[in-house]
Design a protein with these regions (language model features):
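Intrinsic-disorder/low-complexity loop/linker signature
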Residues: 8, 14-16, 26, 44-45, ...
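DNA replication initiation on ssDNA origins
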Residues: 1-71
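Conserved His + Asp/Glu catalytic blocks
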Residues: 107-108, 147-153, 159-297
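Non-catalytic peripheral regions of nucleotide-handling enzymes
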Residues: 53, 111, 305-307
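Residue-level detector of short, conserved catalytic/binding motifs and their immediate flanks
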Residues: 53, 81, 153
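Signature for HUH/AEP ssDNA processing cores
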Residues: 61-149
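Short beta-strand element of the conserved SAM-dependent methyltransferase core
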Residues: 85, 157-161, 319
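C-terminal non-catalytic accessory extensions
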Residues: 191-194, 295-338
């Protein structure tokens, strides 16, 4: 996924990177005096393109990285489920906080995400599955978000290595089986629990909170003015999500620098390993990883030139804006099918 607001920088021979500015500006080809004073030589040091981390492309790539890691984590276990936890009217009362209605100026009550509810749920799940079901290794990836229409707080949780003895099929929605579990519902205890089988699609939907979460210098102010806590994610650590798959398949992954993912409608798609895998592999095989990086750079440069020269006659900044707008419109057109 391309960045729509890339930065330009220089990497010195000692590995230090200095960021110059936005690649969309036309003055990016020369290093300013501020960089020269830091010892950057624009003729001998390596010029690099750095993703901004904030645009639609970067956020979507970040969410896909997490979806990939969750998908690969799930491949290491026999039973994995996707849970949606919602609040009933009685239990949503403890989430209400005062806020000012911007249209009327009145003080109103709004429901805000409460991370501790999710943390307590996971603690109870792990304790019960260890004590009752002899399973001490339940792992998870979860997010807290607000509903798109009613802004009601809720949670999505992927549970890995999680056999549910009393799983009951209650519906079939858009081709997806929907289950419930009396045991899991009692452990949540604050509203409804719906359960689906986990897939790359459910992982992608869970990680999609990054597309909605505000970022940047105004983010804290926006949440403060709204009177609510931001969307968030929590996950198992030590080891991280996907680590087991990396350990079992790292030689195969980096021999071809790619991982094949099954498509929902059949076939497969090969993508680069998640950055988390890159970090692990770089620590173990620094020389091999350096070779891989050089190959990636050559491919990226060819793709970059084709993107700006072979596909458009628009000025760089206009083309980036158009690309991002098209991607935003595509995302808005998507409808939840789970």
């Amino acid at each position: 996924m391309p960045c729509y607001s890339p930065m330009i920088g220089w990497r010195k021979k000692d590995g230090t990177v200095y960021i110059y500015g936005d690649l969309r500006n036309e003055n990016w080809k020369t290093a300013p005096e501020s960089l020269l004073s830091k010892g950057v030589n624009p003729y001998t040091d390596e010029r690099i393109i750095i993703p901004c981390g904030k645009c639609t492309g970067c956020r979507l790539e970040y969410s896909k990285q997490w979806a990939d890691r969750c998908y690969l984590e799930a491949k290491m276990w026999k039973a994995n489920y996707w849970l949606t936890l919602t609040y009933d009217e009685e239990h949503i009362q403890h989430l209400l906080v005062p806020a000012v209605d911007k249209k009327t100026g009145e003080v109103i009550k709004v429901a805000s995400l409460y991370k501790k509810d999710l943390q307590d749920f996971m603690k109870r799940i792990r304790e019960r599955w260890k004590r009752v079901h002899d399973n001490p290794n339940v792992r998870f990836y979860a997010c807290g978000e607000y509903g798109e229409q009613n802004h009601r707080p809720h949670f999505h949780v992927i549970l890995f290595n999680f056999v549910i003895p009393d799983l009951e099929l209650i519906a079939n929605k858009n081709g997806f089986a929907v289950f419930q579990s009396e045991e899991v519902s009692k452990i949540w205890g604050m509203g409804n629990v719906t359960i689906n089988r986990n897939s790359w699609l459910t992982a992608a939907y869970t990680a999609r909170y990054m597309m909605k979460k505000r970022k940047g210098k105004w983010a804290k102010q926006e949440y403060a003015e709204a009177g609510i806590n931001p969307e968030f994610c929590l996950c198992s650590r030590k080891p991280g999500i996907g680590y087991g798959y990396y350990e079992a398949h790292k030689d195969e992954i980096y021999s071809k620098d790619g991982i094949a993912y099954a498509k929902a409608k059949g076939g497969a798609q090969t993508r680069k390993p998640p950055k988390y895998f890159d970090k692990l592999f770089k620590l173990e095989n620094p020389e091999k990883f350096e070779e891989i990086q050089k190959l990636r750079k050559n491919v990226a440069e060819h793709q970059f030139k084709y993107r700006l020269v072979g596909k458009t006659t628009l000025p760089r900044i206009e083309y980036y804006k158009l690309e991002e707008q098209v991607k935003q419109d595509t995302i808005k057109a998507l409808r939840r099918t789970l």
